[in-house]
Amino acid sequence: MAEEDVAALVIDNGSGMCKAGFAGDDAPRAVFPSIVGRPRHQGVMVGMGQKDSYVGDEAQSKRGILTLKYPIEHGIVTNWDDMEKIWHHTFYNELRVAPEEHPVLLTEAPLNPKANREKMTQIMFETFNVPAMYVAIQAVLSLYASGRTTGIVLDSGDGVTHTVPIYEGYALPHAILRLDLAGRDLTDYMMKILTERGYSFTTTAEREIVRDIKEKLCYVALDFEQEMGTAASSSALEKSYELPDGQVITIGNERFRCPEALFQPSFLGMEASGIHETTYNSIMKCDVDIRKDLYSNTVLSGGSTMYPGIADRMQKEISALAPSTMKIKIVAPPERKYSVWIGGSILASLSTFQQMWISKQEYDESGPGIVHRKCF
């Protein structure tokens, strides 16, 4: 079968969710949690076919009896055995494809250590026998998905937040900034402030409930102090949420106090700058001639940028930091939760990209180091 007829696979491995599918599609076919679960107790039902590990949604649904681990922390793979399980699950259970028949485009965090790219490359060629592969930087793909080649991407997922300035399709590594504050930290913070209200959430299973509350009810206030005043003086901002056991809880100012930590990391006891300042600092590390293009093409990407009100707040905060005459445009595509994957789907289906793949033959000749020469 000719190389041209085979759809490439696009796999975006995030700290929280894995997004996978076929190049040319407009959305990923499979989206599942990047988790591997192992039973906490010895099985007693012989012949029940209990497995020694579960991946993704199955691990999620059996979370009550499992210990859940995330192999990707802060955007970077830290446990390769579990990562291999996630890839195996992606190919064979989710996409139901034979990896040796398809080129594979993987994504990586900005500033991913060199050894990690090599390890990814090695596993793809040696364990899964893929015919060809490529590794692309997540934020760059998000920018492609928005139809741009120049701009600054604020990519905030579950494990890490990055600001990545990109000029004519190339990320500018000296100006990339990383903030170890993302969705998982906000979920933990939400657990903490709900405890103050008298609701107790402690286990890994309960954390998932809190994550759902966060995703459904939180929003970013345009003016935090003013919103706190409104919340204190009326119940207009209160919402209720039904827990799996039928108990109904009410939340008020937690709805916007939780994501406010993105702008004020001191809420989490962190000394870092907020996402608005980090974006500004990233722009200021770039050449003075390209800053205008970055201010006017600030693209939001990733699940933790999905809060209602976040774009308006970013606009307000960056306008306060930037020169007064500067035109500032915050782009918040509705599909930004999946824009990294969508960008990968676009890239892998371009005819001009086909010569960019690292082939099995090149890998066999040069070894894992080939990835640094071909993927930049």
Swiss-Prot record:
GO terms for cellular component: cytoplasm; cytoskeleton. It catalyses: ATP + H2O = ADP + phosphate + H(+). Its EC number is 3.6.4.-. The keyword Nucleotide-binding applies. It is found in: Cytoplasm, Cytoskeleton. The keyword Cytoplasm applies. Its main location: cytoplasm. Transmembrane segments: none annotated. Gene3D superfamilies: 3.30.420.40, Actin, Chain A, domain 4 (3.90.640.10). It holds the Pfam family Actin. One of its GO terms (molecular function) is hydrolase activity. It is an enzyme of class 3 (hydrolase). Keywords: ATP-binding, Cytoplasm, Cytoskeleton, Hydrolase, Nucleotide-binding. It comes from the Eukaryota. Actins are highly conserved proteins that are involved in various types of cell motility and are ubiquitously expressed in all eukaryotic cells. Belongs to the actin family. This is Actin-1.
